[in-house]
Amino acid sequence: MVLAVSLYVNKMTSKVSLTNDQLKDLGLYLIEPARELGEFKLIDSFNNEFVPDDFKGRWNALFFGFTFCPDICPITMGMLSRIEKELGLVAENKIKVFLVSVDPDRDTPEQLKIYLENFNDKFIGLTGGIDQIYNFATRVNAPFSPVINSEDPNYTVDHYGSIVVINPEGKYAGFFRTPHEQEKIRLGLLELINKQL
């Protein structure tokens, strides 16, 4: 395992692209050709309208979850925060991390902002109408089971665990499958940074 990671690190520093099989070993599955996202309008955690074109110009890592999630969401956001800090200037303006809410009834822009500040103040939350979110999630193969008008205030939402990748052209480019391993995702993101736009 250590040898394999070392080989990946050597390839990264020499800017040699990894093969698709090597990317899959890192848990990164790229889709070729990348797919259009379609149209949607969401609201970000700063109360600004967010549309597909807002993904353009950088790589984007999206996790579909919710702020009341008891396990995989905080674990994943914490891991992505550590990765972002490890990458430092290498990733500056080249990768943006998003939490896309699958629970818009509870996840207001303000709630998302407060939640994400616990992990990384560079992260952006996205929320909006359940139909808009569901259609977007379907486009990027991130299924979830919407909960509408639940009488239980402590309800949970079943959702996808992988990390969706959107390329600098604003297209669905692939995903990091579960289970997540921090070092592998870091190396996969480095490979994306090294790719030509």
Which stretches of residues belong to each language-model region?
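N-terminal targeting signals for export/organelle localization
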Residues: M1-E39, Q196
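Short loop/turn microsegments at loop-to-beta-strand junctions
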Residues: L37-G38, N60, Y160-S162
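Hydrophobic beta-strand positions
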Residues: K41-L42, V165
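Short active-site neighborhood of thiol/selenol oxidoreductases, capturing the structured segment around
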Residues: F50-T76, L80
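Conserved helix-turn-beta segment immediately C-terminal to the redox Cys motif
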Residues: R58-W59, T76-L99
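Thiol-based oxidoreductase modules, predominantly thioredoxin-like and allied folds used
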Residues: K94-D107, K122-D131
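Short, internal strand/loop/helix patches
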Residues: K113-Y160
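Thiol-/selenol-based redox modules, centered on thioredoxin-like
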Residues: E151-L197
